């Protein structure tokens, strides 16, 4: 069987002409982000993290295993807030409560 990945379709080339172009474009976008280099939260090195299971990631350099997103290691919702950012959020909540009453 010939090599199914090409420069144009990327990793979705393994599906051939099946499933439609829209879905294959979405898959390509997800898989390029998923297999790209990400920063390890423990050793801070920029490496290709290994996906062990759905949302479980491991750094090949330090061996640190952590929970992240399903398709990418760090999600926007899972971003850790610094204490200063957390205080700012609490201040904004208090202002909102005062204006709402």
From Swiss-Prot:
Gene3D superfamilies, per the entry: 2.20.25.30
The UniProt keywords, alphabetically, are: Metal-binding, Ribonucleoprotein, Ribosomal protein, RNA-binding, Zinc, Zinc-finger
Recorded GO MF terms = large ribosomal subunit rRNA binding; structural constituent of ribosome; zinc ion binding
What cofactors does the UniProt entry give for this protein?
Zn(2+)
Q: Which family does it belong to?
A: Belongs to the eukaryotic ribosomal protein eL43 family.
Q: Which HAMAP family match?
A: Ribosomal_eL43 (MF_00327)
Name assigned to this protein: Large ribosomal subunit protein eL43
């Amino acid at each position: 069987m010939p090599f199914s990945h090409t420069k144009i379709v990327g990793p979705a080339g393994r599906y051939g002409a099946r499933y439609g172009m829209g879905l294959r474009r979405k898959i390509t976008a997800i898989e390029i982000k998923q297999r790209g280099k990400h920063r390890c939260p423990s050793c801070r090195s920029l490496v290709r993290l290994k996906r062990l299971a759905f949302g479980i990631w491991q750094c090949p350099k330090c061996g640190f295993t952590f929970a992240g997103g399903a398709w990418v290691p760090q999600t926007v919702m899972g971003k850790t807030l610094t204490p200063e950012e957390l205080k700012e959020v609490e201040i904004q909540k208090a202002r909102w409560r005062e204006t709402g009453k």
